[in-house]
Amino acid sequence: MHERGPSMSAPTTYRGSITREQWLVDETRTVARLRLEDRAFLDTRALAAHILENNLFQYPTEREVGSIARACARRLDALSSDPDRRDRLTGLIAHGTTEQLRQANLYALMRDNRLVWDFMTCVVESKFSLLDMHLGKTEIATFLEGLRAQDERVATWSPATLNKIRQVLAQCLEQCGMYERKTEQLSTLLLDYDLENLIRENGDAGILPAFGLAL
């Protein structure tokens, strides 16, 4: 898998829970706003209780509200180890434009889940570097099979789980405006200036080619 440089912040855990958690852009914006407005909501129990009581996710049942609220909070926590920088990144998700929200949400996913980090820096970055804009289902599946051979946690995942993860990875790219699933074509982003600067400040400039940018 992609080797991280000394200043890059690749997470260590491959999270199969992405099959359930998925993109969550609206939920993450809701959580980001709450946490910036009231520091009491840095406590995930208080956060989940408030979301549930006020039906802020507008889910038809209460069953998944707590776990999804915790997942959103975990992703926001993963944005940076520096509190000020984390707040600024959270601000892009909470109050930014639609493009800032989507792009920062993808960055949060990368920082939270080694699966997404490796997919972006191994597969997507390689495609951009080769000017090969076709990303087929089989290529994503091959990437996941490679992980399965290298990581004990991933090795326990069933073929059905891996297939669902393949779909979620493609969906995340599409939701961010980087992929068209029908044609299986990638496209580079016009990465938001503020987000790019925060990524650089965060020591993660090495991931910029995964968004189609030069270092």
Where are these regions (language model features)?
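Accessory, usually C-terminal, subdomains that scaffold auxiliary metal cofactors
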Residues: 155-215
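DNA-recognition alpha helix
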Residues: 136-152
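Alpha-helix boundary/N-cap detector
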Residues: 22, 60-63, 67, 111, ...
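Inter-helical turn/loop segments and adjacent helix faces that build the functional surface
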Residues: 127, 149-156
